[in-house]
């Protein structure tokens, strides 16, 4: 903490200038020293917000500051209809009617509300399912709010956008958010196992893995139909249930090549080179998209995602080399370094967080709050405006953090644990000692010119 840095510096200065002497005389009592006599009790506390069954995503409809929805791993979505009075609806907003697999890293992983939710009632989920054949899939679906009750969804309204076979039960990504541009962003892992076992990284003409997709769920006229993909269902007119933004990185290359609708080029990709992007979020003030990407055995990393960015997996892991030798594919030649990475001595599985934009902890304004599932540490990352290394401070710890969110009513940080408990980050209850800002204010010296100490400083 910054407090300890100041205290240590002053203590070392005093020790460097003065050498203690033993004396048989009675020690003089000092009455001028203003250094605090107690250590700080901690800047932050954690208040229990509520208990659930492993929440992996929290979301609220746009412009609704007093409601919040909690996506449980099992496939249930719970709603707090009145945050101010802590009113939790007795019935779940939705229980996904299809089979939701929950082994490994599977489950209901993502939840996002359409920007026009108040008008159309649409919301979207990412969950893992299983076909009758036994194949496990990653599924993105759209549901609709019930017409009879604003705090219930229609379970029969599911429309599947894509339902992709996945051979492993880890590295699913699965977070979804609408960006400031109105498009849906989807995080995608490399399918699982180690060393990019299924060889999905740096591949843009295969399946939806190892990157981040951006799609248009409104199918605006300016955007284009995706290329044919067996795992993306079509409507009665042969159209996909989404379109591809015309400015996605691969679209111009595809169009220049003739625009073959049967091409295997996956135009949905917005960024690639991610191993297991576990939790991402937009900064509401800047629009930056922050992502925590889980490493393999050496580094955990934080990235700010940009259009066309290549984040290096599997030839990079954080700032160091990765397990494979690869050439970036066309359209994603720009390799983007992480904002920050850290070694296994600090943690083993990053959980991406959120940028703090609340009002009750002003010293955290603009800081990215994130954690590590393995070490239980919660950090604040303060970006450097000049682009040099950010400042990182551990601010608390939480057992097995799996997701972060903001309370829309006040901007507070909410932290989800694997156990199901959700905690709120608040100001510490202990009184913070007041530390003098200058040597004069310490009361340790009679004169700063001669550095003669006050009576009682040296026995």
Regions found by a protein language model. Name each.
Residues 26-195, 279-282, 287-298, 346-386, ...:
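Acidic, Gly/Ser/Thr-rich repeat motifs that build Ca2+-stabilized beta-propeller blades
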Residues 401-403:
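Repeated scaffold domains used in trafficking and secretory/extracellular systems
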Residues 1-9:
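Bacterial N-terminal signal peptides that target proteins for export
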Residues 33-51, 86-102, 143-167, 205-276, ...:
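Blade-edge beta-strand/turn elements of extracellular beta-propeller
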Residues 16-22:
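C-terminal segment of classical bacterial N-terminal signal peptides
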Residues 8-16:
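Hydrophobic alpha-helical targeting segments used for export or membrane insertion
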């Amino acid at each position: 903490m910054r407090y300890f840095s100041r205290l240590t510096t002053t203590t070392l200065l005093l020790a460097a200038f003065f050498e203690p002497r033993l004396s048989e005389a009675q020690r003089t009592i000092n009455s001028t020293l203003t250094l605090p006599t107690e250590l700080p009790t901690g800047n932050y506390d954690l208040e229990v917000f509520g208990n659930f069954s492993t929440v992996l995503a929290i979301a609220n409809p746009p412009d609704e500051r007093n409601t919040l929805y909690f996506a449980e791993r099992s496939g249930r979505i719970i709603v707090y209809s009145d945050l101010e009075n802590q009113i939790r609806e007795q019935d779940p907003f939705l229980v996904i009617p299809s089979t939701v697999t929950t082994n490994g890293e599977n489950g209901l992983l993502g939840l996002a509300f359409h920007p026009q939710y108040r008008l159309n009632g649409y919301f979207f989920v990412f969950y893992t399912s299983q076909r009758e054949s036994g194949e496990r899939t990653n599924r993105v679906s759209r549901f609709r709010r019930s017409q009879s009750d604003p705090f219930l969804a229609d379970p029969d309204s599911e429309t599947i956008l894509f339902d992709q076979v996945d051979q492993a039960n880890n590295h699913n990504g699965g977070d979804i958010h609408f960006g400031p541009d109105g498009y849906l962003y989807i995080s995608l892992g490399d399918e699982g196992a180690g060393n990019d076992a299924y060889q999905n990284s740096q591949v843009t003409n295969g399946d939806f893995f190892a990157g981040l997709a951006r799609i248009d769920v409104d199918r605006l006229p300016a955007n284009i139909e995706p290329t044919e993909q067996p795992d993306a269902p079509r409507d009665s007119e042969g159209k996909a249930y989404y379109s591809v933004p015309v400015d996605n990185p691969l679209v111009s290359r595809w169009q220049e090549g003739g625009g073959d609708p049967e091409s295997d080029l996956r135009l949905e990709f917005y960024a690639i080179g991610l191993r297991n992007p576990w939790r991402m979020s937009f900064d509401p003030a800047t629009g930056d998209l922050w992502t925590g990407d889980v490493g393999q055995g050496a580094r955990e990393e934080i990235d700010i995602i940009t259009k066309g960015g290549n984040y290096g997996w599997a030839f990079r892991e954080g700032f160091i080399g990765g397990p494979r030798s690869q050439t970036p594919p066309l359209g994603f030649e720009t390799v983007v370094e992480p904002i920050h990475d850290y070694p296994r001595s600090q943690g083993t599985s990053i959980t991406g967080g959120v940028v703090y934009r609340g009002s009750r902890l002003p010293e955290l304004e603009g800081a990215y709050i994130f954690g590590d599932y393995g070490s239980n540490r919660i950090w604040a990352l303060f970006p450097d405006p000049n682009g040099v290394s950010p400042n990182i401070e551990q601010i608390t710890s939480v057992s097995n953090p799996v997701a972060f969110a903001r309370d829309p009513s006040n901007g507070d940080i909410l932290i989800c644990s694997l156990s199901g408990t959700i905690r709120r980050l608040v100001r510490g209850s202990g009184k913070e000692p007041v530390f003098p800002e200058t040597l004069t204010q310490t009361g340790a010296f009679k004169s700063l010119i001669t550095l003669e100490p006050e009576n009682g400083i040296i026995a």
